[in-house]
Amino acid sequence: MSAVIVNTVEQCGYFNRGQCQSCRHIQVPMAQQLMAKSLELQQLLKPFVAPSAAIFYPPVTGEATAFRNKAKMVVLGAAHAPVLGIVSPSGEAVSLCDCLLYPSDMQKLLHRLTQFVQQAGIPPYRVDKAKGELKFILLTRSQVRGEYLLRFVLRSHNSIERIERALPTLLAEYPQINVVSVNIQPIHMAILEGGEEIFLTENTRLEERFNDVPLFIRPKSFFQTNPQVAAQLYQTAREWVAEFAPKSLWDLFCGVGGFGLHCATKDIALTGIEIEAEAISCAQISANLMGLEKVQFMALDSTDFAQGKNAADKPDLIIVNPPRRGIGEALCQSLSEFAPKAILYSSCNPKTLAKDLEHIQGYHLTKVQLFDLFPHTDHFEVLAMLVKD
């Protein structure tokens, strides 16, 4: 199901003042945004659609505001007057604590975190001088119980003690902050996080739940930022896959297992592949909670896995959910050679989806659906079902 598409325009003060241009289409009515995205998708996939062969289902949408579950805040200003937000096009430090994309409880917590930085006396990192400590605050919200994962990205270990001293007061005020960690990123470059993660709480993962499937978020594991539409994306994948009644299933670029765990049953042999070990750990915990025994998750490169000896047993159906770069020609060739009944391709970049479709041989599109996980931007997710000729 989709939310009713209202032909209204959201009013954002940040955008109107020229302080933030991230939602570049926020002044375009939602119905018009969806029409433009749908047209772009149809044009990109037109070369791969035989007449009357593929069905383009109506776009799936959610709320236009208060939908986002993750905030990535640059920490600016000074220790006595910190600012959580971005640097505007004019070079101004702009607080984004009241961004319309965040739920109201998240906005409130972001304001409290600004106060926390000030009270703890943590100096924000100054890019122009390569001095200071606190680079980013990353906040992730679970819709299950409104719990949070909070990360402080620091240049060094020097301010950890300041955070630890101030943390008990914050956690007493906000017991819904379930996980707190410090990430050390010492490099003077525009890199969001470093290799070292230090947990300041006993809990190390945040629970989320889509369609009664338990999923877990750790600091470095990828997770969809629009829970409402993501739940519909996973449910649609489950329904499309069930039509083929596969006995074996691969979930490549599986992340925390969202697609594979939605599609798996106790009778389906599921193999999930993901390069990030933290995500694989989360996926395995979910599988155990669901009582799935014919499941294996491995921290490997998906292309390397498909070309290696572990891929000897060919599955009935393959799911791919790659990053924006797509799956690449080598993996396209491997999928063509495996010749499963069907390939379910979830793409966050329709341009690379179209490029990959040029290299997947022996398949035709039967279903395509757009999921608008990123309102007011040019980005969207696509679910495409390819069936063996």
Curated annotation (Swiss-Prot):
[4Fe-4S] cluster binds at C12, C20, C23, C99. The active site is at C348 (nucleophile). One of its GO terms (biological process) is rRNA base methylation. Coiled coil: none annotated. GO terms for molecular function: 4 iron, 4 sulfur cluster binding; iron ion binding; rRNA (uridine-C5-)-methyltransferase activity. The keyword DNA-binding does not apply. S-adenosyl-L-methionine binds at Q224, F253, E274, N321. PROSITE patterns: SAM_MT_RNA_M5U, TRMA_1, TRMA_2. It catalyses: uridine(747) in 23S rRNA + S-adenosyl-L-methionine = 5-methyluridine(747) in 23S rRNA + S-adenosyl-L-homocysteine + H(+). It comes from the Bacteria. InterPro entries: 23SrRNA_MeTrfase_RlmC, MeTrfase_TrmA_AS, MeTrfase_TrmA_CS, SAM-dependent_MTases_sf, U5_MeTrfase_fam. Pfam families: tRNA_U5-meth_tr. SUPFAM superfamilies: S-adenosyl-L-methionine-dependent methyltransferases. Catalyzes the formation of 5-methyl-uridine at position 747 (m5U747) in 23S rRNA. Belongs to the class I-like SAM-binding methyltransferase superfamily. RNA M5U methyltransferase family. RlmC subfamily. This is 23S rRNA (uracil(747)-C(5))-methyltransferase RlmC. It comes from Shewanella putrefaciens (strain CN-32 / ATCC BAA-453). The lineage of its organism: Bacteria, Pseudomonadati, Pseudomonadota, Gammaproteobacteria, Alteromonadales. The gene is rlmC.
